[in-house]
């Protein structure tokens, strides 16, 4: 019996959100109904933190509003495997403060290729006549505009979560990013659109949205829309 042989496994199960705990601990698989990322498995997709090799590319991706700044740092190894190695969540920050927090949370000497942000930051602010992207740039943080097709973005996240032929997923998350891990497990399907994730409760959407911006930009060219299934689109894209 796995649980008798490995008490740590039982303790790990008790730390899961209620629906995951009921399913994996007690066999109540109906509890997972509605989970958007039902394929997300902490045993596969969460790993202990480790020292990142200096030749790995690093990126930032964030979701921003006064209600919450959610920033993720992602490293990509030469084989294309992605690791979310840092997270920062903080509310009530104006643009200049948000830019400073993201820069301050980035380790000294850490070279970040680009910072990915959603296209709504390129809308003009009435008070200044400038875009929020311009305000971020003035605060020292230039941004890369991502696509915002929600379905394509979620499909890209699911593609990264999918294990390859050797059983290795395209995305892992350091255990030191508990907020993202929890929010991914808590996200539900939109009851009106099964291909989309629910926008409520809003508090759990910020981290997954930031991951969506990264995944869509990493797998798909910004601004383009996928045609057919994501895998077919990728094959055509990289042919």
Model-derived features with residue positions:
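Generic recognition of flexible, low-complexity loop/linker segments
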Residues: 47-49, 57-61, 71, 101-105, ...
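Histidine-centered active-site/metal-ligand motif
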Residues: 206
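A residue-level signal for conserved active-site and pocket-lining positions in enzyme catalytic cores
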Residues: 25, 71, 115, 184, ...
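Short, hydrophobic alpha-helical segments
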Residues: 214-222
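Anionic group-transfer/hydrolysis microenvironments
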Residues: 63-65, 120, 211
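Short beta-strand scaffold segments in enzyme catalytic cores
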Residues: 69-75
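ATPase catalytic-site recognition across NTP-hydrolyzing enzymes
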Residues: 1-62, 67
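Mg2+-dependent endonuclease catalytic cores in nucleic-acid-processing enzymes, primarily RNase H-like
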Residues: 78-202, 221-225, 229-239
